[in-house]
Amino acid sequence: MKKISQVLNWLSSLKIAILLLLVIAVSCAAGTLIPQQESNQFYYDNFNKNPFLGIINAKILLLFEFDHVYTSFWFLFLLIWLGLALSVCSFRRQLPILKSALNWIDYKSPSQIAKLSVAQTIVTNNCAKSLEKIKLNLKKQGWNVKETDGRIAARQGVIGRLGPILIHLGMILLMIGATYGSLNGKTIEKFLAPGRSIDLLNNNEEKGLTIELQKFQIERDPQGRAEQYKSIVNVIEPNGNNQSKEISVNYPLRYKGLTLYQADWSLAAITIKIDNSPKLQIPIKPISELGEQVWGTIIPTNKDGKNQILLTVDSELGPVNIYDNDGTLLTKLIINKEEKVKGALIKIINIIPSSGLLLKHDPGVPFVYLSFAIILIGGSLSIISTKKIWVLHENEKSMIYIGGLSNRNLSGLSKELPNLISFLET
């Protein structure tokens, strides 16, 4: 039993809780700085040449699961450990403190009053009348008063003792929600062109919601840089019910546990005509060798496929750069303009952008929201001072002894106590 008690004392230690919080905070920072859920090759390409913090290369990063910090075994272990420590602390420390605060303590001798943090002694002509005045004054100021055989005990702000327990409960609930969301949540990143859709599967691997992109718009500043991008999406249920809403950066769509974010933008295709051909919608892909946001494709200009040109574009507004096989820039075509290129008449009809959508289903979100509400309530209650006052009298000496203590703001109580005495003396 002694060893169990020692283990429980160690678990409920404030130092251990602070250390765990610090480690978890550092881990979260690492999870923010290191890209998550990428392929192994991504980490080898990016962290072997430039190790994280100068020492953590791809091998170490993958070994310790820094590629998925929030679902790694050690991070979940830290959350469970902290939750256990907070639970033990609540049961072994905070609940007894609350229970003690709820119990009435009966001080019977002036020497006990004298040992309190704040104490005063006054002389009165009528002890019984003075005690009655003090009792009525305390009740008037919102104190909970109990009188036993001419002795008065009063308390105020006991509810403040509930604050730390609620904070612990909220933090435990927060970790439960975070863990549950990490293990059962799903995240999908998808680029959709207008008119395209994505089908989502439910828990039974059956078709669930359908997300359809109706319209996508990129707002640019005078220099041509993307400032905001907006999508009009349609969420369609299997029964045919649907909801249409515009989303943009920082303004997501929330629908029955699913959150749909406007995360990015891209270019999907170029609609083009070559000589007398019908309109051709040609997919384009990012070309990182030419720049961070450059898309392009290679097309032939004649039927044998040998006379090829490279089309590149960096904006849905154009222009389209056309290069020869050797990399020579042949021309720049704006939308709806046609030009002869290597013997072929080429016309750009339009450039089709695509919306980068981030879909998140996190079943732990309700727990997280509830936990923050509980933590806020607990934090507000913790501000409340728990104060206690005792009043005794000695008829033989015509003396009244009054004293009190407070878990915080003792100076406030020391100022409040003389007010009770001055009220009595007047």
UniProtKB/Swiss-Prot annotation:
Superkingdom: Bacteria
Alphabetical list of InterPro entries matching this protein: Cyt_c_bgen_Ccs1/CcsB/ResB, ResB-like_domain
Residue pairs linked by disulfide bridges in the UniProt entry: none
Alphabetically ordered keywords of this record: Cytochrome c-type biogenesis, Membrane, Thylakoid, Transmembrane, Transmembrane helix
Pfam family, one: ResB
Keyword Membrane: yes
Residue ranges crossing the lipid bilayer per the database entry: 14-34, 72-92, 162-182
GO biological process: cytochrome complex assembly
Cell compartment(s), UniProt: Cellular thylakoid membrane
Keyword check for Cell inner membrane: no
GO cellular component: plasma membrane-derived thylakoid membrane
Membrane topology classification: Multi-pass membrane protein
Record function comment: Required during biogenesis of c-type cytochromes (cytochrome c6 and cytochrome f) at the step of heme attachment.
Family: Belongs to the Ccs1/CcsB family.
Subunit structure: May interact with CcsA.
HAMAP family tied to this protein: CytC_Ccs1
Name assigned to this protein: Cytochrome c biogenesis protein CcsB
Highest classification ranks of the organism: Bacteria, Bacillati, Cyanobacteriota, Cyanophyceae, Synechococcales
